[in-house]
Design a protein with these regions (language model features):
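Conserved phosphate- and dinucleotide-binding cores of soluble alpha/beta proteins
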Residues: 6-154
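Conserved S-adenosyl-L-methionine
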Residues: 1-2
Length: 154
């Protein structure tokens, strides 16, 4: 088995991940972001990180995630998101603050119907079950209420 890692531009975190996996003895290959959808048929699962996971299962992630997730869906390859609890937002994706111009060039909203499950420290959840997780973790709502006005005023 081999791990295919996207470069993940512009920061290129994939380069670090491939180096760490290789150092651990895991066969890993770096794939250009634009090439990843074409390589999805070679995989058993697509594992994504997320910048934000909304209560309805919508994901905010880097540009290029939607084509990868759609290619996976079309190939019958499950898409799984791994995210820390702190990245959960207590509102649905439709209520996400508008992205600033520079953010629109870097991020996009991935619909929940492209995601099979989300893995957190609290366990694995179907996108439809995230609301119950968010409701159990009060600091998510409190933190969001503090930062949402800042995002709206930029």
């Amino acid at each position: 088995k081999k791990v295919l890692c996207t470069v993940s531009k512009p920061v290129e975190e994939g380069r670090t991940l491939v180096a760490e996996l290789s150092e651990a003895g895991i066969d890993a290959e770096l794939v250009e972001d634009a090439d990843a959808p074409g390589r999805v048929k070679e995989t058993d699962v697509v594992l994504l990180g997320a910048d934000t996971v909304f209560r309805d299962g919508t994901i905010c992630n880097k540009i290029g995630t939607i084509p990868l997730a759609r290619a996976a869906r079309d190939a019958g390859v499950p898409v799984v998101v791994a995210a820390e609890l702190i990245k959960l937002a207590p509102v649905p994706g439709a209520q996400a603050p508008d992205l600033a111009d520079f953010e629109r060039e870097l991020f996009e909203l991935i619909p929940a119907d492209l995601i099979i499950e989300v893995v957190t420290e609290e366990g694995t959840f179907a996108p439809d079950d995230l609301a119950s997780l968010v409701d159990r973790v009060p600091f998510l709502r409190e933190g969001y209420e503090l930062v949402a006005p800042l995002a709206a005023n930029r």
